[in-house]
Amino acid sequence: MGKKLLIVASKRYGDYVKEIAESMGCFEEISFVDNDREGAIGKLEEVETFYPEYNCAIAACDDGAKRLEWNKKLEALYNIPVLFHMDSTISPSANLMPGCIVEPRAVVGCGSTIGQATVIGANTVVEPYSFIGDSCTLKSGTIVKSTSVLEIGTETEQGTVLFTPLTSKQ
């Protein structure tokens, strides 16, 4: 059985997530489950009924906390993938947790960790040895300077430059 992906609770971001998944070339079928999307194969309350026909699922909500909440529900049945556009650059030593979505031309540097259900926007740069918490949304063009630590749920605006080093308490 090949990989089949459900994109859940996506609203308008779902089309972009589908294009990212398609660029990877590893899913034989990609469908939507949503209450407000024309062409969805089912409603949110029916999401469990698509297992085992679909073996992968990912939440694509705009809101980071809801994305994380949905992925936690989905992981009871489904594999939660990391989706990264083939035009992104991810260091082999970077650690991307389940539910991450990496948009085109984003760069994730060596030794960096990207938390669950985090979106790395197009043209965003996460410099080496940074830690990005769960359910963050780094919008297009964000730069996270080396060794930065971003808290759970951080959301940036386009073009933001961040340097938030881990500070030790003495």
What do these predicted regions represent?
Residues 1-86:
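Terminal amphipathic alpha-helical/low-complexity segments used for targeting or macromolecular assembly
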Residues 83-170:
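Structural signal for interior beta-strand "rungs" in well-ordered beta-sheet cores
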